[in-house]
Amino acid sequence: MKLAYFSVTGQTRRFVSKTNLPNVEISPDDDIEMNEPFLLITPSYAEESPTVSKSIDVMDPVFDFMAYNDNYKHCLGIIGTGNRNFAGIYIFTAKELSAKYQIPLLYDFEFNGTPADVAAVEKLATQLDKGAKVTFKNPL
């Protein structure tokens, strides 16, 4: 199972580099077409007000990637990464994409993840490769 990921500060890139999974990095400069099943790993950068929360512009490449040639149709699940100290906007971008495209949110981790997070994502990818149904593994 391929991982498609976006990294702003390098934390998501560091996480993905610890896995033994094929991957592609989403770039604001390239149009990437996915013709195979993949998992999306995305950080969250959002703003929160009393009436609305939304992802900020730095996350536009992820939204553009998912829309490009209907890449979202090949996405089997979304994994969110962030910082729990941000409370209501923790993994917000992953939740927003999950709702927009009706793609399951399968896992979340903080920063560049732990060895247990790496193992869990590799296990999810293996299960999905075998056609298994998986559900969200971490409490929000």
UniProtKB/Swiss-Prot annotation:
Example GO molecular function: FMN binding
Disulfide bond entries: none
GO biological process assignments: protein modification process
Similarity comment text for this entry: Belongs to the NrdI family.
Protein's job: Probably involved in ribonucleotide reductase function.
NCBIfam families reported in the protein's UniProt record: nrdI (TIGR00333)
PANTHER family on file: PROTEIN NRDI
Protein known as: Protein NrdI
Organism: Lactococcus lactis subsp. lactis (strain IL1403)
